């Protein structure tokens, strides 16, 4: 890597995925050094699951992949931004973005798939 990344004590960084065309924020997840390397190698977003403690490719089971157009790093090197072309919905709940609710609980996003049909 040509930029130093400041991984936290768990050796992770927060990663925001943003639709490269619309600018919509799709999701927030975490990446390890291996996830960043795999994303660069394949051109598809990879993340690190803190709950499963494993590397995962976005869309690996759903087919709703994120093709990376560019990876950006914030000024402190402690967060990254994936600019992506999203295939299908970004959220495992079936919505186009994980940010589909207001703080008051109003739904502002669009449900684009039924998660029960994808995740059995």
From Swiss-Prot:
The keyword Zinc applies. GO terms for biological process: L-histidine biosynthetic process. One of its GO terms (cellular component) is cytoplasm. Binds 1 Mg(2+) ion per subunit. Binds 1 zinc ion per subunit. It comes from the Archaea. Pathway: Amino-acid biosynthesis; L-histidine biosynthesis; L-histidine from 5-phospho-alpha-D-ribose 1-diphosphate: step 3/9. SUPFAM superfamilies: HisI-like. It catalyses: 1-(5-phospho-beta-D-ribosyl)-5'-AMP + H2O = 1-(5-phospho-beta-D-ribosyl)-5-[(5-phospho-beta-D-ribosylamino)methylideneamino]imidazole-4-carboxamide. Homodimer. This is Phosphoribosyl-AMP cyclohydrolase. The gene is hisI. It comes from Natronomonas pharaonis (strain ATCC 35678 / DSM 2160 / CIP 103997 / JCM 8858 / NBRC 14720 / NCIMB 2260 / Gabara). GO terms for molecular function: magnesium ion binding; phosphoribosyl-AMP cyclohydrolase activity; zinc ion binding. Zn(2+) binds at residues 75, 91, 98. PANTHER family: HISTIDINE BIOSYNTHESIS BIFUNCTIONAL PROTEIN, HISTIDINE BIOSYNTHESIS BIFUNCTIONAL PROTEIN HIS7. Signal peptide: none annotated. Mg(2+) binds at residues 74, 76, 78. Keywords: Amino-acid biosynthesis, Cytoplasm, Histidine biosynthesis, Hydrolase, Magnesium, Metal-binding, Zinc. It is found in: Cytoplasm. The lineage of its organism: Archaea, Methanobacteriati, Methanobacteriota, Stenosarchaea group, Halobacteria. NCBIfam families: PRK00051.1 (NF000768). Catalyzes the hydrolysis of the adenine ring of phosphoribosyl-AMP. Belongs to the PRA-CH family. Its cofactor is Mg(2+); Zn(2+). Gene3D superfamilies: Phosphoribosyl-AMP cyclohydrolase.
């Amino acid at each position: 890597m040509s930029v130093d990344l400041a991984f936290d004590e768990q050796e992770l960084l927060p990663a925001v995925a943003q639709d490269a065309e619309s600018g919509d924020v799709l999701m927030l997840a975490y990446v390890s050094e291996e996830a960043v390397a795999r994303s660069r190698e394949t051109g598809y977003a990879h993340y690190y699951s803190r709950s499963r403690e494993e590397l995962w490719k976005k869309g690996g089971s759903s087919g709703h992949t994120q093709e990376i157009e560019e990876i950006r790093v914030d000024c402190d090197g402690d967060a990254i931004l994936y600019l992506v072309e999203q295939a299908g919905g970004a959220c495992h709940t079936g919505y186009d973005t994980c940010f589909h609710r207001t703080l008051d609980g109003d739904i502002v996003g669009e449900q684009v798939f039924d998660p029960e049909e994808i995740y059995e």
